[in-house]
Regions:
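Short, basic/low-complexity N-terminal boundary segments at the transition from targeting/disordered tails
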Residues: 2-14
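Alpha/beta-hydrolase superfamily serine-hydrolase fold, recognizing
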Residues: 4-5, 19-200
Length: 200
């Protein structure tokens, strides 16, 4: 039996990326203290005195990896381009913290932000949530939960939202999608990883 080395897998997540910001962006790490645990978050914002809208951004990583560090430049750029305060959540990861730990962390951070909005100079009536991959799924889950009433907008970026069984995925055909010819083999190899996870 081959076992997955979770620590090695986590080290491989993310890829080098550029900081595209042209303005100064503040990064403020903070530890949200709840009655039973602490959740690390990071605020990204243009440093000014104005009350800002807020975007909670949830990283991807298949619920087993990823972190704010992987998407640091993306969060900085989102803050610069939107003028909003971006809050990245370092939710608990599986397998050390199985479901619903990540979901609970994200929901609890949204609640905490609403109750501490004045302290962080954010507008609790203009709070959105976004995420990519597993983070997109967590964002939608938050939007459908009891904290959804606080959210003005939910933005899933390629979240796992299809409820079809793996046997229903045979319609997939790579030829239906335009790919730069020299990148095709690489793209197919990457996409096949997801199909192989489902045994299809």
């Amino acid at each position: 039996t081959t076992y997955l080395n979770i620590h090695e897998l986590r080290k491989e997540m993310g890829s080098p990326n550029l900081d595209l910001c042209t303005e100064e962006i503040e990064e403020i790490p903070y530890l949200v203290s709840l009655s039973d645990r602490k959740i690390p978050i990071t605020f990204f914002r243009i440093p000014n005195k104005e009350k800002q809208s807020a975007i909670v951004f949830i990283h991807g990583g298949g619920y087993i990896g990823g972190s704010t560090l992987v998407l640091q430049n993306q969060c900085r750029f989102l803050a610069e381009q939107s003028g909003a305060t971006v809050i990245s959540i370092d939710y608990r990861l599986a397998p050390e913290a199985p479901f619903p730990a990540a979901f609970d962390d994200c929901k609890d951070v949204v609640k905490w932000l609403v109750h501490h909005a004045d302290h962080w100079n954010i507008d609790p009536n203009n709070l959105s949530i976004a995420g990519e991959s597993a983070g997109g799924t967590l964002a939608v889950s938050c939007g459908l939960s009891e904290v959804g009433k606080y959210l003005k907008l939910v933005i899933p970026i390629y979240g796992a939202l299809d409820v079809c069984s793996a046997s229903d995925l045979d319609y997939w055909d790579y030829d239906l999608y335009d790919v730069i010819p020299e990148h095709k083999k690489y793209v197919i190899t990457r996409l096949n990883r997801f199909r192989n996870l489902n045994g299809t």
